[in-house]
């Protein structure tokens, strides 16, 4: 395979399934990312995972050896959602259905976080949904009631699963599906991959023309389709969710199929 790295100046690089799976770090992938950086390539880490804030991702990346990363080098779906809502509608009263990282990003953008009591009296502007490891029956009920009462139903991302060292676990898309069933409504807005909003934010941060940008990820349904939706090339890494069998059966094909991130530099 030709040296792919020579063809691109900018990379939108996924994290889960590319640099790590849960607590298991892919050390060779870390080496590749650092090599790309040393070659002068621009990298923005683009992840649908909203459980951590951008600052928390910087901390994790530095801990595994990506010492050069800054907060502006990370775009996750929690940040993108909070930013987009503020820009489009101003600060909102938000019921956050997710983990601490989502709460942080919403507050940093000036949104007011409200609790379940507000959902039952219909005084919520938006229910923002990410992956929530503490989801309960009553939390689903409160969020669904707010949505039925007129709150915007906003999904940070549609990922039904995400890779861990133990295998696939339920993702934000699973939470979204539960709220669709409970509220009888579809999301008013989905921000994360494969949808355009998160790519547009990431591209503005990257600052490189599209023809010189490569999307690198482990999912056909978000990374590859998302890249196609915004006119970007894509590389699918087989260290996460997608399998070669799934790629062969899919009508949507990535530009490159990599057994590991190492092949970017081969």
Positions of predicted regions on the chain:
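Conserved phosphate/oxyanion-binding catalytic-loop motifs
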Residues: 49
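Asp-based, Mg2+/Mn2+-dependent phosphohydrolase catalytic module
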Residues: 1-15, 20-39, 52-75, 82-266
